[in-house]
From Swiss-Prot:
Binding site residues for Mg(2+) 2: 269, 271
Cofactor: Mg(2+); Mn(2+)
Keyword DNA damage part of the UniProt annotation: no
Family per record: Belongs to the D-alanine--D-alanine ligase family.
InterPro entries according to UniProt: ATP-grasp, ATP_grasp_subdomain_1, D-Ala_lig_Van_CS, D_ala_D_ala, Dala_Dala_lig_C, Dala_Dala_lig_N, PreATP-grasp_dom_sf
Chief location of this protein within or outside the cell: cytoplasm
Protein name in UniProt: D-alanine--D-alanine ligase
Annotated GO CC locations: cytoplasm
Recorded metabolic or biological pathway in which this protein acts: Cell wall biogenesis; peptidoglycan biosynthesis
GO molecular function: ATP binding; D-alanine-D-alanine ligase activity; metal ion binding
Annotated localization: Cytoplasm
Summary of the function given for this chain in its UniProt record: Cell wall formation.
GO BP annotations, alphabetical order: cell wall organization; peptidoglycan biosynthetic process; regulation of cell shape
Organism: Geobacter sulfurreducens (strain ATCC 51573 / DSM 12127 / PCA)
């Protein structure tokens, strides 16, 4: 949609939601809402609950700017509802959102496309796992299949720590991942209009870039752009775009990597609805690597809003 067309519409900023990342979503949505209103758009907040269809109709929402994180927002469910209601929306479509949210399926897609991922084992509720027997050894990373912002994630350094880590992860999902721990630098790639904008390195104060480090000032250092050999920097940008394409993402995303001392790049995940808070990484990459300020970034994402399902009957 064009800027002029969007100025005549009512934009609902979808935020909050039902996931464990509700508070982060409210922060992202609040920042986006302020940016849109400052640019003269008729934008209103929509706190997403199970009455979302009724709210969208009652508020006469024409376009949805999705600022949801986690389940029931980042996983294709809301995207499917918007497709059914014929409301154009920002970000990736139903399938790409669902694939990216499910770390197990996403890893299978990445591996099929030749992208490097850490060795892993899927553990389902009621099963046990021995990292030594799997060839991983310790430490390992234990994480739920379908949560974001490091919710339910643990770094396990010994057999004694494994049961509590599994118990924590199973609070959030019936399927979890046990991955070989890769020691390396955390590099994240920002994607806008399906092209890599640049990279950022995260150096957490503590050992692990956890939920607190992601959303608390002073808990992590951001280095943008990261200090990398030129060839490695180019490779990360290219692999970031490749991961975005592999899942069929559209518009924007953030792609997370671990880079070892030897220059190996391990793809961790693709975030189809990255945070848009004051401490979020995508806005920082946009500004420092591409000279795109926050309001411009929000507007460019808005302009990309569309229905992804094409064909007869779509959006009618």
């Amino acid at each position: 949609m064009t800027r002029d067309e969007l100025k005549t519409t009512k934009i609902g900023v979808l935020m909050g939601g039902l996931s464990a990342e509700r508070e982060v979503s409210l922060a992202s949505g609040g920042a986006v809402l302020k940016a849109l209103q400052s640019r003269g758009y008729d934008a209103v907040p929509v706190d997403v609950g199970r009455d979302l269809p009724q709210v969208l109709v009652r508020e006469w929402i024409d376009v949805a700017f999705i600022c949801l994180h986690g389940r029931y927002g980042e996983d294709g469910t809301v995207q499917g509802l918007l497709e059914l209601m014929g409301i154009p929306y920002t970000g990736s479509g139903v399938l790409a959102s669902a694939l990216a949210m499910n770390k197990i399926v996403a890893k299978e897609v990445f591996a099929a496309r030749g992208l490097t991922i850490a060795p892993y084992r899927v553990v389902r509720r009621g099963e046990t796992v021995d990292p030594v027997a799997e060839g991983f050894g310790y430490p390992v990373v234990v994480k739920p299949s379908q949560e974001g912002s490091s919710v339910g994630v643990s770094i396990v350094k010994s057999p004694e720590e494994l049961p509590s880590a599994l118990e924590l992860a199973f609070r959030y999902d019936d399927d979890i991942l046990v991955e070989r721990f890769i020691k390396g630098r955390e590099i994240q790639i920002g994607i806008l209009d399906d092209r890599a904008m640049g990279a950022i390195e995260i150096v957490p104060v503590n050992e692990f870039y956890d939920f607190e480090a992601k959303y608390t000032a002073g808990k992590a250092e951001h280095i943008c752009p990261p200090v990398l050999p030129a060839e490695l920097h180019r490779r990360l940008l290219a692999e970031g775009e490749a991961a975005h394409r592999a899942l069929g993402c559209s518009g924007y995303s953030r792609v997370d990597f671990l880079v070892t001392e030897g220059g190996e790049c391990y793809l961790l995940e693709v975030n189809t609805l990255p945070g848009m808070t004051a401490l979020s990484l995508l806005p920082e990459i946009a500004l420092k690597e591409s000279g795109i300020g926050f309001e411009d970034l929000v507007e460019r994402i808005l302009i990309s809003a569309e229905l992804k399902i094409k064909g007869e009957g779509a959006g009618s």
